[in-house]
Amino acid sequence: MATLEQKLQELLQSSVEDLGCELWGIECQRAGRYLTVRLYIDKEGGVTVEDCADVSRQVSAILDVEDPIADKYNLEVSSPGLDRALFTLDQYQRYIGQEIVVHLRIPVLDRRKWQGKLEKIENDMLTLIVDGQEQILVFGNIQKANIIPKF
């Protein structure tokens, strides 16, 4: 069964692309009785406030008609930022050679948090260089991952 994020991705992807943006990812978080639905959008040259407003209006209209969310919710639309979360293997592929931090669902070697240079991706396996050593992580075990920006 698809998650709410996957259902929303399928429902909203083409509409966001029609507005000239890429739907980078979706996060749904419960806070009390409300659900926060957070859409991250990106585009060549960066996202403007107007882009976020346009996407928010379009997505709100779609969600009002399709009604895929049973709970009360707040919609947020923003850029993924410099420390952007990575949602898909294609996104990881774009950041090979970059430093990332990964949080796992199930610990590997008694650790849930790994930070290192993303070396390569083969099938559903990511190889990080952590303290000079290769560490292989399974994509399906990743709960969350973010780019560590360079300044």
Curated annotation (Swiss-Prot):
GO terms for cellular component: cytosol. This is Ribosome maturation factor RimP. SUPFAM superfamilies: YhbC-like, C-terminal domain, YhbC-like, N-terminal domain. Required for maturation of 30S ribosomal subunits. The keyword Cytoplasm applies. Gene3D superfamilies: Ribosome maturation factor RimP, C-terminal domain, RimP-like superfamily, N-terminal. It is found in: Cytoplasm. Keywords: Cytoplasm, Ribosome biogenesis. Belongs to the RimP family. It comes from Pasteurella multocida (strain Pm70). GO terms for biological process: ribosomal small subunit assembly; translation. Disulfide bonds: none annotated.
